[in-house]
Amino acid sequence: MYVVSTKQMLNNAQRGGYAVPAFNIHNLETMQVVVETAANLHAPVIIAGTPGTFTHAGTENLLALVSAMAKQYHHPLAIHLDHHTKFDDIAQNLRSGVRSVMIDASHLPFAQNISRVKEVVDFCHRFDVSVEAELGQLGGQEDDVQVNEADAFYTNPAQAREFAEATGIDSLAVAIGTAHGMYASAPVLDFSRLENIRQWVNLPLVLHGASGLSTKDIQQTIKLGICKINVATELKNAFSQALKNYLTAHPEATDPRDYLQSAKSAMRDVVSKVIADCGCEGRA
């Protein structure tokens, strides 16, 4: 009942003029932070995981946790495959119960990207599974994939329309100047490009690489059509730095129930801020 499709979430966001945050989690504690914070704020959220996370934690384990927490907190949740690239991997996760997928073929030439994505869409839609794909490519590192800045490229607005129509995707991830990881200096986002994409494509648009973006930039992208905001690195950094600080100050600590609390608290602050930036509090 409480594990829902991202398609309905994002369509609601598009109509309501806000964005749904997708938080990348890795284990029980990081999932607890996201779900507890979202439930307290009555905010829709997406629980996202890269291929590495699903391998690390196990698909069935993650699904069981999401289902149990959704029921415990009486809060709708979606679980999402983030930056998955292999058809067999996606199909296996769907058979386990995942109902939202990002197929990332953005590294391929345009025609091959369309072909790969359409294959996944045709399969997923048979099971009422929503599909996100990316046109353009972000720089930085996501999981084990490293894209050099020189190889990154922005989304072409006219191609975006052709891509959306040819593939039948439910949401489109765009490249407008963000990158995976944290920024050494503030990025300059191409808002005019985003506005142009919005004029060509009526699907919910997705922004990857949002860790470290200013509130002003996030809210401007939402005004121009972004309906899903992905955050990963900022969560990991907050969690790990707080944990390091605690263990440095308390070298005698051995109980994870104690030393993980400061890490969870630091991550909770980031989740709360992103929810506020997305304008989705009270929208669940």
UniProtKB/Swiss-Prot annotation:
| Catalytically driven reaction(s) | D-tagatofuranose 1,6-bisphosphate = D-glyceraldehyde 3-phosphate + dihydroxyacetone phosphate
Q: How is the cofactor bound?
A: Binds 1 zinc ion per subunit.
Named in its record, the pathway it takes part in is:
Carbohydrate metabolism; D-tagatose 6-phosphate degradation; D-glyceraldehyde 3-phosphate and glycerone phosphate from D-tagatose 6-phosphate: step 2/2
What name is this protein filed under?
D-tagatose-1,6-bisphosphate aldolase subunit GatY
Organism encoding this protein = Escherichia coli
One GO MF term on file is: tagatose-bisphosphate aldolase activity
What's an example GO cellular component term for this entry?
Answer: cytosol
Coiled coil stretches, renumbered = none
What keywords sit in the KW lines? Galactitol metabolism, Lyase, Metal-binding, Zinc
The cofactor(s) it depends on are:
Zn(2+)
Q: What is its EC number?
A: 4.1.2.40
Q: Where does dihydroxyacetone phosphate bind?
A: G181, G209, A210, S211, N230, V231, A232, T233
Could you say which enzyme class this protein belongs to?
lyase
What is the annotated role of this protein in its UniProt record? Catalytic subunit of the tagatose-1,6-bisphosphate aldolase GatYZ, which catalyzes the reversible aldol condensation of dihydroxyacetone phosphate (DHAP or glycerone-phosphate) with glyceraldehyde 3-phosphate (G3P) to produce tagatose 1,6-bisphosphate (TBP). Requires GatZ subunit for full activity and stability. Is involved in the catabolism of galactitol.
User: Matching CDD domains, A to Z?
Assistant: TBP_aldolase_IIB
Top-rank taxon: Bacteria
Pfam families cross-referenced by the UniProt entry: F_bP_aldolase
Residues of the active site: D82 (proton donor)
Summarize induction of expression.
Answer: Constitutively expressed.
Oligomer and partners: Forms a complex with GatZ.
Q: Which residues bind Zn(2+)?
A: H83, H180, H208
Q: Which family does it belong to?
A: Belongs to the class II fructose-bisphosphate aldolase family. TagBP aldolase GatY subfamily.
